[in-house]
Design a protein with these regions (language model features):
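Bacterial N-terminal signal peptides that target proteins for export
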Residues: 2-12
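Intrinsically disordered, low-complexity regions enriched for glutamine and histidine
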Residues: 4, 29-32
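Hydrophobic helical h-region of N-terminal Sec-dependent signal peptides
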Residues: 12-20
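Sequence-level preference for short, compositionally simple segments enriched
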Residues: 33-387
């Protein structure tokens, strides 16, 4: 099938799956709720009248209980941002123009000389702690220098333990989060979705080890997922997803019409689509890997470059009840599947479960998001809003 034929096949399936919602050409019909049609506060990198110089200060000044849109001008804003009020919308000048950046990694001491470290879940550059938060047209980057540490050989005295460094965390208090034309940059654990529903449209996410992970329900559309290289040769240089979806939750990470790409230096056949994360959890009878975290990742009509492993999925270690280590297997301890994958990394074999035509209607946008219609911002509306 030629490129044109494949494109028509993809568009036809998109129309079927999304009920005619032509997101590829500019978004669904106007969704319910207040549109993003005014700027309530501005953040600029230089001192200016009627503008904040800190994103956090603009959020802190927002009133409670109503949508509040904050425009962030061009520049690199070096700060951690905690969004703890419902209805906050951050609108940048473009993902190549507005960057929120900060460096923090899991093994970093919380203070000089302290034995306490931040741990993975306190490293996020931007942390969403409230529902109905939207991010448009900006970049979030955890600037911890993972590659420098990765170059050090095992056993080197300067090698760091705890290199996880999150760019964006969707916390358990969040729900109905929107990311549109957003770039997330990191290495290990770039995007952490702890809970709630998140819609990611026309965005970019870059990393290598488990760089999309967690128990949240995330729907990705027309988004580039980019694997980054490692310093030394290894069988698997990373894993795209590490879901910990609870068994009672029907949807985990769902990718519709996305692209799995790679930076220069990522070898062929080196990146599985995912592995099952069973986080260590405290129970009445001890602390061990959560047996109910049967992670779910689904790829539909996704382009896969040659770096995607032919085996498709991989196993992951966890803590057994007796404290020993055990392996969780992709075909028995997770819910992994795909449909309509294409490109050099698309393979058909018994290790890569396929969604049947009968089950395909279960993966519409409306079903995956439980009938929530996200409010999006077209490129034209963005230009008019920020001019």
């Amino acid at each position: 099938m030629g490129v044109r034929g494949r494109l028509f096949r993809i568009l036809a399936l998109c129309a079927t799956l999304l009920g005619g919602c032509a997101t590829l050409l500019g978004g669904c019909a106007t969704p319910p709720g207040q549109p993003v049609d005014r700027i309530d506060a501005r953040v600029l990198s230089a001192q200016s009248d009627n503008a904040f110089t800190s994103i956090q200060a603009a959020i802190d000044a927002a009133p409670d209980g109503k949508p509040w849109t904050i425009f962030i001008g061009p520049g690199v804003f070096e700060e951690r941002v905690i969004i703890n009020k419902p209805g906050i919308r951050l609108v940048g000048s473009g993902k190549r123009n507005t960057t929120i950046a900060y460096a923090r990694y899991a093994g970093e001491p919380v203070a000089p000389g302290s034995e306490e470290t931040w741990g993975t879940f306190r490293t996020a550059v931007v942390e969403v702690l409230a529902p109905d938060v939207s991010l448009f047209d900006l970049t979030i980057e955890n600037t911890y220098d993972y590659p420098a540490d990765d170059k050090l050989p095992k056993g080197h005295p300067d090698k760091i333990r705890g290199t996880q460094a999150v760019a964006l965390k969707i916390a358990e208090q969040a729900d109905r989060t929107v990311l549109q034309r957003v770039t997330l940059l990191g290495y290990q654990d770039t995007l952490y979705a702890q809970s709630g529903r998140t819609y990611v449209l026309d965005s970019e996410i870059a990393g290598h080890v488990d760089f999309i992970f967690g128990a949240g329900n995330m729907l990705f559309e027309y988004t580039d997922v980019i694997s980054r290289p490692r310093a030394h040769p290894m069988t698997f240089t990373g894993y795209v997803t590490a879901p910990s979806t609870l068994i009672e939750q029907e949807y985990g990470f769902t990718f519709l019409n996305c692209r799995l790409l790679r930076e220069i230096g990522v070898p062929d056949n080196s990146v599985p689509l995912g592995r099952p994360w069973h986080p260590t959890t405290t129970f009445d009878d001890g602390r061990y890997a959560n047996p109910n975290a049967i992670g779910k990742s689904t790829f539909i009509n996704t382009f896969m470059d040659g770096h995607i492993a032919q085996v498709g999925w991989s196993s992951m270690g966890g803590t057994a009840k007796d404290g020993s280590r055990k392996r969780f297997m992709p075909l028995t301890d997770a819910r992994f599947s795909e449909f309509g994958s294409y490109g050099p990394g698309a393979h058909s074999n018994t290790d890569r479960p396929q969604i049947s035509m009968a089950d395909l209607p279960l993966y519409t946008k409306e079903k995956a998001l439980n009938d929530w219609t996200p409010t999006t911002l077209s490129r034209q509306a963005h230009r008019l809003l920020i001019q």
